[in-house]
C-alpha cells in the first residue's frame, strides 16, 4: 500500500451477530448430501432438482441448478468408480454367469506352458474353468503342493511360480477325474 491509502479492517466481535438467528439451520440436499448451491457439481443435477422441487421448493427460487452442459460446449463427464474395467474381469464375470463354460462349445482342453520371467520361470495353466473347476481352490492346492506362489491372473488362467509343468501333467488328472490325460496339452516353453 502507498502512504495515502488506508485499509478498512472489520474486526469480528466475539459473540452473536445482530440480525442472525442462532443456531444456524443448514439445509442439505437429500440426494447428494451437499448444500443446495453445490448440487450443480454433484453430477446428479436431475435427481437433485427433483428432490428440491418436492421437498424444498423455496430453495429453487434463488438457485440455478443447470441441466445443460457448460456454456463452452463441453459435456460434463461423470467420474465413475474403478477406473478402466479390465477385460479379463469382465470375461470372468461372463464365464461365471454362463456356468463356467466357454462360448461356442469348443473342445475342453487344459493347456500348460512354461514362461520365462527374468532369471526364473513360471508355469501358466489355462482351461481349468471349462471343466467347472474352481480356480481359487486349484491355485491354493498348487501353492501347497509345490510350496510356491500361485495366483489366478485371468478369467481362466493360473500362474504358478516355478517350472512344475511335468508334475502338473500327473496331478491334474489325479485330483480332477473329469480331466483326462488326452485333454491336457503341453505347449512347451514360450519364447521371449
From Swiss-Prot:
Signal peptide segment: none
Coiled coil: none
Domain SUI1 residues, every copy: 117-176
Any one Gene Ontology BP term: translation reinitiation
Top-level taxon: Eukaryota
Disulfide bond sites: none
Cited InterPro entries: DENR/SUI1_TIF (IPR050318), DENR_C (IPR046447), DENR_eukaryotes (IPR005873), DENR_N (IPR048517), SUI1 (IPR001950), SUI1_dom_sf (IPR036877)
GO molecular function term, any single one: translation initiation factor activity
Region annotated Disordered, chain positions: 62-116
Entry-linked SUPFAM superfamilies: eIF1-like
Biased amino acid composition, Low complexity: 87-99
Homology family: Belongs to the DENR family.
The protein's name in its UniProt record: Density-regulated protein homolog
Taxonomic lineage from the root: Eukaryota, Metazoa, Ecdysozoa, Nematoda, Chromadorea
